Each structure stands twice: as structure tokens, then as C-alpha cells.
Amino acid sequence: MLTSKNNFHKVAPFYEQNALIQKKMAERLMELVEKNVGCEFDDVLEIGCGTGLFTKLIQKKINYNRLFLNDLHNFISFEGGYDFLEGDIEEINLSDKFDIIFSNATFQWVKDFEQLIQKLYQSLKPQGYLCFTTFGEENLKEVKRITNVGLNYLTFNEYLDFLGRYFKIVAHYHTKECLYFQSPVDVLKHMKLTGVNSVEKVQWTKRDFVNFCESYEQFKTEEGYLLTYHPFYFIVSKNKEVCYD
């Protein structure tokens, strides 16, 4: 995964109270799971579990025998009831087979998405499911327009194309969510406390900061200063055999 994900430990204590969109995405994803694939699964894996925001929904909504959680480090504040797989999901070995794999607001950090889904395909049991959310190309577009810094997001159709090579598409959905802040400074604080962008890697001078705040005035509305999120939702099933070259 991209190196910015390594900095999550700095914001972990503040994440859940500030990750308003990610929480909404988690709840919506679980609704789609309940509607489309049910809640009975033996072996469950969550990729990029972070502080356990989505994990709590799994524990509440899914009937499982074993729960495996993955992230670069263990930020979970509660103990017991899971096996932790520490490391970059693109690099670690997945020796178990899973009935369902979840991930909420993590795959935007992946370097090679197609290689990852090949790996996850092989790690699913027959008829297993991959259910995840991520972000699209218009995510945080206001900040990127000003700074020219941001992640290189895949488009919705690119995700569908990659997924369709290996899985049956069960459900897919995308939308836009808007947050409003009292000032451009509050926009930056929000991004810092949720770790959602790579802007923090840039060395800002005082002039850069002033220029950012002045430029952000173009996104001022009656509700406040606009920040756009672009969530994607996917549920896919492993119901066909794929031949690898």
C-alpha cells in the first residue's frame, strides 16, 4: 500500500470521531451485505480494519465462527474474539480460506488493485464474497484542484472492469457526499485527523498555507466550505473459475 497509510498511527486516536463519511460508508456497506448476501459466514476477513469502525458492525451483524482482522498495525481498542494478521495486505501471505472478505475505505491506498484482487480471489472459498468500499476520482477534488496533490483514484468503470474479470458483480453503487466546514483551516484539520489524503507529505511554507486558504474561498457556500467525498460500493462473488496465464 502507499506510504501515507503508514502514518495512520498518528491519527488513530482521533479517527472515529472525525471519520463521518467512512462511518456512513461502513453502515451502508453492511446494509448492502445484509440485503444481497446474508449474514451467515464461517470464516471472515476484514482488510484495513483500522480502529475497528467496521469491525464493530461485523461483530454486531454477522454470524461467524472465526474473524480475521488485518492492518499494518493493530489499532483495535477492544480485545479478544479475532485473529490479527499484521502487515500490508499486498505483501502478507494469506494461508486461510475465507467465506467473505470485507474492506471499508482502504483500497484507494492499494498500489496494484488487479494483483490484489487476484490474491483475494484465490483466498476465497468457492461461492465466497468480496465486499468493499473505496473512493473515486472526484474524492477531495477541491483540495486537489488547489494543491495538485492527491491519490490516483481508479474510476468506477475501471473497478467494474477489473472485478468483472474474476468475479460476478452482485451489487455496485456510487454517490457523492459533501461536508461543510467553518474555514479552510478546518478542512485541513479534518483531513489530518482522518488520514484521507497525501497532502500531509507536502512541506508547507507560511505562504503556501495562506495561498491555500485564499484559494479555498472559491468553495465557500451558504452551508460552509465544501469538501466532496466520492464513495464507491461493491459486492462481488466468486462463482466462476478463472484461468491464469
Swiss-Prot record:
SUPFAM superfamilies: S-adenosyl-L-methionine-dependent methyltransferases
Catalysis performed (reactions): malonyl-[ACP] + S-adenosyl-L-methionine = malonyl-[ACP] methyl ester + S-adenosyl-L-homocysteine
GO molecular function: carboxyl-O-methyltransferase activity; malonyl-CoA methyltransferase activity; S-adenosylmethionine-dependent methyltransferase activity
Keyword S-adenosyl-L-methionine applies: yes
A Pfam cross-reference name: Methyltransf_11
Pathway(s) served: Cofactor biosynthesis; biotin biosynthesis
BP terms from Gene Ontology: biotin biosynthetic process; methylation
Enzyme class: transferase
Enzyme Commission code: 2.1.1.197
Record key words, sorted: Biotin biosynthesis, Methyltransferase, S-adenosyl-L-methionine, Transferase
Keyword Ribonucleoprotein: no
NCBIfam families (alphabetical): BioC
Family under the similarity heading: Belongs to the methyltransferase superfamily.
Entry function: Converts the free carboxyl group of a malonyl-thioester to its methyl ester by transfer of a methyl group from S-adenosyl-L-methionine (SAM). It allows to synthesize pimeloyl-ACP via the fatty acid synthetic pathway.
UniProt protein name: Malonyl-[acyl-carrier protein] O-methyltransferase
Species in which this protein is naturally found: Calditerrivibrio nitroreducens (strain DSM 19672 / NBRC 101217 / Yu37-1)
Gene assigned in the entry: bioC
